[in-house]
């Protein structure tokens, strides 16, 4: 699909740039430094949209001392700057905001530092976030971090308190992240029954049941939905509703970006502007006169998906 293809391109850009920095810097330094990256979020799940940032973590081997970590920080900072200016039309935006301690945390950590943080201080949302971690390239250190997350996330089912914390966090996201002045139903990602509802439901089911079933340990939303169906966690009708809404929502997001341009604001919102709505509808295969049919289909699909979400998300035990 498009999301996976975009990830292939992104992987090639990021890994090539990182390798170039390695070659350039190691020509100046006596001691080689090898930085590896792990993808998170939609990047980790291979579900990128056209305007997605690339959420990543940077990791180095435990043998790195303070001087090596300083060099690694400088190199990653330059890598971010290089990629962000690589294209005016669609820059490659590396985002490290999901790293331990957020913006106040180190850009680069050793493997041991990551594992110690997650074992001792991580919050439940960080465990949920790590479900979509993917090692970039073939490096041993990034793969070791991935292997750790598989054990960490699926060591045991969520406790009742952890489940409740995720549920409350979803309430806060719904209340705080949808911009004012927008009909929530028109927000493809964050609106009721939208892509976020599907993702949160899938991840909660994975965290609850993945410790007993390794087939549920996938970063792909599509694959996770299918595995949840096969294991009786979703009925056939629930699966079909979630899968079809997910696919339709992703198609709408891509059409919205193409119709409005990558720099346009509100790219996850079905537009009220007739000209933009017509352009979006025609990209989706509708005629000019069928633009309202596209909107109606989304409203119907997301409403039914919200019913599935309400039934399952608040009653997981």
Regions found by a protein language model. Name each.
Residues 1-317:
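A nucleotide- and high-energy phosphate-metabolite-utilizing enzyme signature
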